[in-house]
Protein backbone atom coordinates (compact mmCIF):
# COMPACT_ATOMS: atom_id res chain seq x y z
CA UNK A 1 0.00 0.00 0.00
CA UNK A 2 2.79 2.39 0.90
CA UNK A 3 4.70 1.64 -2.32
CA UNK A 4 1.57 2.30 -4.39
CA UNK A 5 1.00 5.65 -2.66
CA UNK A 6 4.62 6.63 -3.28
CA UNK A 7 4.27 5.69 -6.96
CA UNK A 8 1.14 7.82 -7.30
CA UNK A 9 2.81 10.81 -5.61
CA UNK A 10 5.89 10.51 -7.86
CA UNK A 11 3.69 10.27 -10.97
CA UNK A 12 1.80 13.41 -9.97
CA UNK A 13 5.03 15.31 -9.27
CA UNK A 14 6.47 14.25 -12.64
CA UNK A 15 3.30 15.38 -14.44
CA UNK A 16 3.38 18.76 -12.70
CA UNK A 17 7.05 19.23 -13.50
CA UNK A 18 6.59 18.38 -17.18
CA UNK A 19 3.47 20.54 -17.48
CA UNK A 20 5.55 23.59 -16.54
CA UNK A 21 8.16 22.99 -19.25
CA UNK A 22 7.77 24.84 -22.54
CA UNK A 23 7.63 22.65 -25.64
CA UNK A 24 10.95 21.79 -27.30
CA UNK A 25 10.88 22.65 -30.99
CA UNK A 26 13.26 21.89 -33.82
CA UNK A 27 15.10 24.97 -35.00
CA UNK A 28 14.17 24.27 -38.63
CA UNK A 29 10.47 24.34 -37.68
CA UNK A 30 10.91 27.71 -35.94
CA UNK A 31 12.90 29.15 -38.86
CA UNK A 32 10.21 28.03 -41.35
CA UNK A 33 7.54 30.15 -39.63
CA UNK A 34 9.03 32.44 -36.97
CA UNK A 35 5.86 34.54 -36.77
CA UNK A 36 4.00 31.52 -35.39
CA UNK A 37 6.41 31.41 -32.44
CA UNK A 38 6.93 35.17 -31.90
CA UNK A 39 6.50 36.07 -28.23
CA UNK A 40 5.99 32.44 -27.19
CA UNK A 41 8.20 30.64 -24.71
CA UNK A 42 9.87 27.57 -26.19
CA UNK A 43 12.87 25.35 -25.64
CA UNK A 44 15.64 24.41 -28.06
CA UNK A 45 18.68 22.19 -27.60
CA UNK A 46 21.88 21.64 -29.52
CA UNK A 47 25.56 22.51 -29.73
CA UNK A 48 27.02 26.02 -29.64
CA UNK A 49 28.81 26.77 -32.91
CA UNK A 50 29.58 30.48 -32.44
CA UNK A 51 29.35 33.07 -29.66
CA UNK A 52 30.33 36.59 -28.67
CA UNK A 53 29.59 38.87 -25.78
CA UNK A 54 30.97 40.84 -22.87
CA UNK A 55 30.25 41.48 -19.20
CA UNK A 56 27.91 38.54 -18.74
CA UNK A 57 25.66 38.93 -21.74
CA UNK A 58 25.92 38.22 -25.43
CA UNK A 59 24.71 35.94 -28.19
CA UNK A 60 25.47 32.38 -29.14
CA UNK A 61 24.47 30.21 -32.10
CA UNK A 62 22.79 26.88 -31.32
CA UNK A 63 22.69 24.13 -33.98
CA UNK A 64 20.35 21.19 -33.35
CA UNK A 65 21.14 19.30 -36.56
CA UNK A 66 18.04 20.67 -38.33
CA UNK A 67 19.12 24.30 -38.37
CA UNK A 68 20.74 27.04 -36.32
CA UNK A 69 19.38 29.90 -34.21
CA UNK A 70 20.97 32.77 -32.32
CA UNK A 71 20.21 33.07 -28.60
CA UNK A 72 20.58 36.29 -26.59
CA UNK A 73 21.59 35.86 -22.96
CA UNK A 74 21.33 38.90 -20.73
CA UNK A 75 21.75 37.25 -17.34
CA UNK A 76 23.36 33.83 -17.73
CA UNK A 77 26.61 34.37 -19.62
CA UNK A 78 27.61 32.94 -22.97
CA UNK A 79 28.69 29.31 -23.34
CA UNK A 80 31.79 28.42 -25.31
CA UNK A 81 31.87 26.93 -28.77
CA UNK A 82 31.19 23.19 -28.69
CA UNK A 83 29.08 23.29 -25.51
CA UNK A 84 25.90 21.22 -25.47
CA UNK A 85 22.97 23.33 -24.23
CA UNK A 86 19.21 23.31 -23.70
CA UNK A 87 17.77 26.83 -23.71
CA UNK A 88 14.35 28.21 -22.71
CA UNK A 89 13.28 31.59 -24.01
CA UNK A 90 10.93 33.71 -26.10
CA UNK A 91 11.20 34.11 -29.85
CA UNK A 92 11.65 37.67 -31.09
CA UNK A 93 11.78 38.81 -34.67
CA UNK A 94 14.35 41.51 -35.43
CA UNK A 95 16.96 42.10 -32.77
CA UNK A 96 20.21 44.09 -32.71
CA UNK A 97 23.27 43.41 -30.56
CA UNK A 98 26.91 44.36 -30.94
CA UNK A 99 26.36 46.16 -34.22
CA UNK A 100 24.68 43.11 -35.80
CA UNK A 101 21.05 42.55 -36.74
CA UNK A 102 19.36 39.19 -36.21
CA UNK A 103 16.10 38.46 -38.09
CA UNK A 104 14.93 35.89 -35.49
CA UNK A 105 16.44 35.27 -32.07
CA UNK A 106 15.61 33.41 -28.86
CA UNK A 107 15.72 35.68 -25.78
CA UNK A 108 16.85 33.40 -22.95
CA UNK A 109 14.43 33.53 -19.97
CA UNK A 110 15.70 30.70 -17.75
CA UNK A 111 19.13 29.45 -16.80
CA UNK A 112 20.15 26.83 -19.35
CA UNK A 113 21.00 23.22 -18.60
Q: Predicted regions: what is each one?
A:
Residues 1-21:
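Sec-dependent bacterial lipoprotein signal peptides
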Residues 17-113:
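OB-fold and OB-like single-stranded nucleic-acid-recognition modules
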Amino acid sequence: MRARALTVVLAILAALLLAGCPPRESISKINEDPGRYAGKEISIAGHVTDSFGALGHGVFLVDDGTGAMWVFSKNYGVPGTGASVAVVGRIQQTFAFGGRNFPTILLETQRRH
